[in-house]
Amino acid sequence: MGQEQDTPWILSTGHISTQKGEGGQQTPKLEHHNSTRLMGHCQKTMNQVVMPKQIVYWKQWLSLRNPILVFLKTRVLRRWRLFSKHEWTN
């Protein structure tokens, strides 16, 4: 994730102590509930950033020139258009 100074929950609170992890490595230990809440918020924000990337990768995968994928893509698009037309007419 980067250096410890870069993590927002370490910068935001003074309630950080260290604990020894596996291999004797020192890791920050969150003791204050606000730090934990902020860490959860950061994870949610990261998930929101990752989601558009996943969509882009999915679209790139769909655009590959594989005959099976092209067939599936056109079939799904046809069904979607038929479904949309049906919804609009009702």
From Swiss-Prot:
Sorted keywords for this record are:
Apoptosis, Host cytoplasm, Host membrane, Host mitochondrion, Host mitochondrion inner membrane, Host nucleus, Host-virus interaction, Inhibition of host innate immune response by virus, Inhibition of host MAVS by virus, Inhibition of host RLR pathway by virus, Membrane, Modulation of host cell apoptosis by virus, Viral immunoevasion
Lineage of source species: Viruses, Riboviria, Orthornavirae, Negarnaviricota, Polyploviricotina
Q: Which domain of life is it from?
A: Viruses
Family designation? Belongs to the influenza viruses PB1-F2 family.
Q: Which residues cross the membrane?
A: none
Where in the cell does this protein reside? Answer: Host mitochondrion inner membrane; Host nucleus; Host cytoplasm, Host cytosol
* Chain positions of site Low pathogenicity: 66
Q: Where is this region: Disordered?
A: 1-30
Miscellaneous comment: Is not encoded in all strains, and seems to be dispensable for replication.
UniProt region (Mitochondrial targeting sequence), positions on chain? 65-87
**The protein, known as:** Protein PB1-F2
One GO cellular-component annotation of the UniProt record comes to: host cell cytosol
Alphabetized HAMAP family for the sequence: INFV_PB1F2
Q: Which organism is it from?
A: Influenza A virus (strain A/USA:Iowa/1943 H1N1)
Q: How does this polypeptide assemble, per the annotation?
A: Oligomer. Interacts with human SLC25A6/ANT3 and VDAC1. Interacts with host MAVS.
Range of residues in the leader sequence: none
Role of this protein: Plays an important role in promoting lung pathology in both primary viral infection and secondary bacterial infection. Promotes alteration of mitochondrial morphology, dissipation of mitochondrial membrane potential, and cell death. Alternatively, inhibits the production of interferon in the infected cell at the level of host mitochondrial antiviral signaling MAVS. Its level of expression differs greatly depending on which cell type is infected, in a manner that is independent of the levels of expression of other viral proteins. Monocytic cells are more affected than epithelial cells.
Q: Where is the composition biased (Polar residues)?
A: 14-28
Question: Which BP terms from GO are recorded?
Answer: symbiont-mediated perturbation of host apoptosis; symbiont-mediated suppression of host cytoplasmic pattern recognition receptor signaling pathway via inhibition of MAVS activity
